[in-house]
Swiss-Prot record:
Impact reported for residue 218 to A: Induces EGTA and SDS sensitivity
A GO MF term: zinc ion binding
Family matches, as PROSITE patterns: EF_HAND_2
Protein name: Peflin
One GO term of the biological process aspect: axial cellular bud site selection
Residue stretches of biased makeup (Basic and acidic residues): 23-37
Amino acid sequence: MCAKKLKYAAGDDFVRYATPKEAMEETRREFEKEKQRQQQIKVTQAQTPNTRVHSAPIPLQTQYNKNRAENGHHSYGSPQSYSPRHTKTPVDPRYNVIAQKPAGRPIPPAPTHYNNLNTSAQRIASSPPPLIHNQAVPAQLLKKVAPASFDSREDVRDMQVATQLFHNHDVKGKNRLTAEELQNLLQNDDNSHFCISSVDALINLFGASRFGTVNQAEFIALYKRVKSWRKVYVDNDINGSLTISVSEFHNSLQELGYLIPFEVSEKTFDQYAEFINRNGTGKELKFDKFVEALVWLMRLTKLFRKFDTNQEGIATIQYKDFIDATLYLGRFLPH
């Protein structure tokens, strides 16, 4: 089945497949294609002749000796050798993909603090542009190749971390994680474990191969999605309370692409929020309930797109299909 990607004014640009298993297979295929493309680009760069040599100026040392020979002077000494200096142009660390790494070194772990990223960016910005065979790399090449390569390296790191977590918590050694094992793995910012309803929601979304569990490939997809949601959650926790309010929840949905009115965000928030702080005056969302709410919105959006045949944000549904859709969604109602 060919994947169909829709552009909506509301929703998270979710790619529709027959099953989550097909989605994961498509992700692996895209990763392999990107890897082959990067290898082909490297081969092409190595084989491309340097056209800048023909227009380069004569080195200072050669011109100096030539002038002295024409004037009848002997070369008793030579001036300081010419060494071209590159302009210090700030380079985004994501784009600095030409620097060679010693063979055999493992891929460094992903940085856990934004301060580390900023420090790295400042260090790279103070160095000259990267070189290929002692020639400056064109800026167009960096812009074209680097972002995809950076994403690929980050994707590989995510797969390594997720794989290690999977094996660490696969207590029974069955290459599958149960709801209890997944609950022991997933934690909120206050070190409390995810509630079982949030764990069940994730398993129902990603566990396509066998009901009630996730295999390694399914867990990797789950890990990547939860990681991206956590970044949005932390960014919108303005006061650092480890929970988010209804306004922060609405801003999170807007950032994820769910362009819905505040009233709709508020109703969704009320379905999952709890009175966490006894001294507080309103409900709050912890990260596990935030994830559960997003899983519910994903299901609603995906089902809506099924009946939005013109991709205009307007669904036309027959009465029979409406009943079937309602019964289907009823299996995943918040509890």
